[in-house]
Structure formats: structure tokens, C-alpha cells
Amino acid sequence: MSTLETWPQVIINTYGTPPVELVSGKGATVTDDQGNVYIDLLAGIAVNALGHAHPAIIEAVTNQIGQLGHVSNLFASRPVVEVAEELIKRFSLDDATLAAQTRVFFCNSGAEANEAAFKIARLTGRSRILAAVHGFHGRTMGSLALTGQPDKREAFLPMPSGVEFYPYGDTDYLRKMVETNPTDVAAIFLEPIQGETGVVPAPEGFLKAVRELCDEYGILMITDEVQTGVGRTGDFFAHQHDGVVPDVVTMAKGLGGGLPIGACLATGRAAELMTPGKHGTTFGGNPVACAAAKAVLSVVDDAFCAEVARKGELFKELLAKVDGVVDVRGRGLMLGVVLERDVAKQAVLDGFKHGVILNAPADNIIRLTPPLVITDEEIADAVKAIAETIA
């Protein structure tokens, strides 16, 4: 039996049976078991930041697995320290005081990073956590409690208590929620760009307003950069576009370039709330995953991020000329293509015929999160293919 025939007989039915079997990849392209080549505009859902089979990752992972594969956090290893140092440097933007106050907790995924942030919020002793309507923070119970999408939560009620939802981007509404009892609000969670709901950027000034509100009432500002981080939007962290410094940042996806790794960065008092016994992880900080992350970070520097921003503008410019496209949202290489008709789901299926891998978070929206190494030529070819899928 083929892989696709065997799949539903052995895999729990969380995603259905995939339409194709992928067997290899290089850069921003992947190849299926029939030899068909596709431009990958999804990158494992914003995971393969450096594309497929990047030589820096291959070398780093191969060398590390040959030395030390796993040790647990009962012992120290050099790769985890080096990645933590680099993340703190990127977060602090070389502010020595901020860097000295920042610490990192490593885990295996975005959901786990958000679980850690949830615990940090709880450790403030305050009971209310405010999260955004339509936000997405993961599928584990804690991260799901923070997710403002009732259809994903309904089957698993009751949720962990204390989470309330505000309309994303509505500063006045959020302030009213806080001021009903400000001393009981532990944290405000937000994504700088909501990804799963169709790539919706926060309105201009919203992150700054949240930062000011948090400062006013001693509330933790927690930004979920699981999808937006590691250069995806043209800045290393998307919140840096708005010139704010959160108390806690969660990240994963692109950090390992394809290997599972997540991180929760906390600064100031938020970094001091976790103490021995309060949290833990078996696999978090795995030397091999950290070696991959170190390789990714060695490539994703300021010049690389500037190129991501430029490529994003090229994508927008070309997509704006496509019949049936009414808007292109997002920044860098995290884009939501808003269609005139509800054909996005069909476009995903038709994309295979035209040599592109697409994703549709809504009936009229195509989400593009390609490898950050995609070339201008591949972008042009991809836009032509998208035009054909929605024609």
C-alpha cells in the first residue's frame, strides 16, 4: 500500500488524509513521490525559515548529533547557552540593561512556550488574563484557553479559568476591561499579527497603547511571536516594528529551521517569577535542536531581515496586479491575500496542479509564509501560479 493509502489506517484523524506525499526539498521548493516540484509558499506553516536542506542546518545538526544528542536540563550543554545569549541580544537590541534582566526558557513548540507564559502570568498572583478575540496560541489546554476562537475550544470545555477576551486592536474596549478591576489583571496576551485568523496586523499604535496600559497598572505585556518571530515580518521580532518592549515573548516555528524548538523570553520581574519546581521540560533545550537554532540565527541577521522586508514588498506589488485579489495584508513574508470570491480552499487544491503549495485560513484568504530564502524569480513564478488558481 502507498503512504497515502496507509495514512488513515495508522494516523489519528486530526488533519484528514494529506493530498500528496512529499519526499524531498531544496531551498523554497519541495518534490512529491511522483516527481512533481512545487514552490513551497507555506514552509511547514512558517517553520522552515531557511527553506529545505539548508547547508548550515545540515552541518550543525550532523555535528551535534555525533557529539551529544540529549542530556535533559539536569545538566548544562553549550548550544542552549549560546542560543539563549543570541536571543537575548536580538530581543534587547544591544541594550545592556535590558539584556541583563532577560532570561530564556526553552521548550519544544509554540504551544509549550505559551503555556510557560501562562504560568508566568499566574505567578503574579493576579487572576485575570486578557487575550484577543480571534487570536490563536496553541491547542494544549492552557494555550487553548488563551485562543479566542470558540469553535476550537467548544469540544474541550471547561477551559482553565480567568481568561477574558477583548476585540483585537480596540484600545478603548481593552482599557475598559482593565479598569473594571485593574489590580486583578495579570497579563495582556496578543499577536503582533494574527496569523490563523487570516493574517491580520494589529492597527497602527495598538502595541504602544497596550504597553502604556500595562505600565500604568503593573500588567505583563505578553506577545506571541510564534509565527511572526525570527525575521518573518522583516524585523527579527514583529513587536520591534512598533518600538515596544514586551515583558514576555513566546516563539517557536522558524527558530529551529524545521527542528522542534520553542522559547519563552521574560524580562524584569517576569523573569524572576519562575523558580525551581514551578515549571520544567524534558526535551526543551535539546542540544541538537539548539544547534539548528544557532545555525538559523547565524543566517538571520539584520541584512537578511531587510531582504525579507524587500521580498514582501515585491510579493505585494505583484499580487496587487492579479485579477480577483482585493487586498494583501501583513508584513515581510507573512502575507494574507484577500480574494474577491470565496475560492481560497479550492485554490489550495488547484495549487498542486500549478506547482505551488498554498494555505487557506479562511474561505476568501490565502496565507503565504514561504521560506525566507525564496528568490525573486520564485516569487514571480508563484504569483503567476496563484493567478491561475483563482482565475
From Swiss-Prot:
- Name the GO terms of the biological process aspect: L-arginine biosynthetic process
Keyword Cytoplasm belongs to the record: yes
Class of the enzyme per the UniProt entry, highest EC level: transferase
Primary localization: cytoplasm
Q: Where does N(2)-acetyl-L-ornithine bind?
A: R139, T281
Subcellular localization is given as: Cytoplasm
Q: Which InterPro entries match?
A: AcOrn/SuccOrn_fam, Aminotrans_3, Aminotrans_3_PPA_site, Class-III_PLP-dep_AT, PyrdxlP-dep_Trfase, PyrdxlP-dep_Trfase_major, PyrdxlP-dep_Trfase_small
Q: Which residues carry this modification: N6-(pyridoxal phosphate)lysine?
A: K253
Kindly list the positions annotated as binding pyridoxal 5'-phosphate.
G110, A111, F136, D224, E225, V226, Q227, T282
Give the required cofactors: pyridoxal 5'-phosphate
- GO cellular component, as recorded: cytoplasm
Keywords linked to the UniProt accession: Amino-acid biosynthesis, Aminotransferase, Arginine biosynthesis, Cytoplasm, Pyridoxal phosphate, Transferase
Reactions the enzyme catalyzes: N(2)-acetyl-L-ornithine + 2-oxoglutarate = N-acetyl-L-glutamate 5-semialdehyde + L-glutamate
Q: Where are the transmembrane segments?
A: none
Is the keyword Repressor assigned to this protein? no
Q: How is the cofactor bound?
A: Binds 1 pyridoxal phosphate per subunit.
The metabolic or biological pathway listed in the UniProt record of this protein is: Amino-acid biosynthesis; L-arginine biosynthesis; N(2)-acetyl-L-ornithine from L-glutamate: step 4/4
Q: How does it assemble?
A: Homodimer.
What the record says about family reads: Belongs to the class-III pyridoxal-phosphate-dependent aminotransferase family. ArgD subfamily.
The UniProt record's further free-text remark is: May also have succinyldiaminopimelate aminotransferase activity, thus carrying out the corresponding step in lysine biosynthesis.
* Name of the molecule in the record: Acetylornithine aminotransferase
The gene name on file is argD
